[in-house]
Amino acid sequence: MIVHVLLAWLAGALSWPSPPPDLHIVFRSEFVYQASTRTTSNEWWVSEGKSLARQGDRLSIYREDLGVVWRASVKAGTYTETKIQPTGQPVPTPPVPGKVDMHTAGYYWEPSYDWAVKASGQSSTIAGRPCREFVATGDADYAESRVSFWACDPLPGVTRNPTDTVAAPLRSASVKKMIFDTLAKHGGAWLLAAEEQQEPAIAPTMVMRVRVETLEAVTAPPGTFEMPPTFKQAGR
């Protein structure tokens, strides 16, 4: 009888679905303003309830499952700890912002763009994935914006979506929303590259480029989402 019970339990355990694979992303961003170009390389690991972001000497580990974020300086071997809302708990409603216009916001003014988006018909391979291009133009008072972005179909069996991560360096919230809405209309496609050009009426053109170099669904190395034991918490 015991043998039958053990065999039944083992058969059930073997039939349990394995967790979806982690997602590993490496991408490069470029910010061009006048004659200056600033290039940054970013690495992300994304798993269930946790992620890691690495940018040069800076390391951030987000543990939604534990309700904490660790931010570290690899060179100094120190880190800070910030509490966040754990997974599954309601997020507090943010306060309603006051009225903001271009005079009060100044450099951070975000115009309200009217977007026209279309598929260009162009295709390319980015990080080993076949991609298609979309182009968009945005008109607003005192500003114009032109955006091109490349998208691929999701990797089979992968539930993590890299789009938020890849779009993070883009400067305009309106551009990001336009990209998110467009990809949602095309089967939840993933963003792998984008170029954003903003032309304010009273400032030089600003260009932001982002492009994925590595995209793979693999299991993260052991300890990826843990703070290295040799690191010390700042202020202690």
Please provide the spans of the model-predicted regions.
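Sec-dependent signal peptide recognition
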Residues: 1-9
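Extended soluble regions of mature proteins
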Residues: 14-236
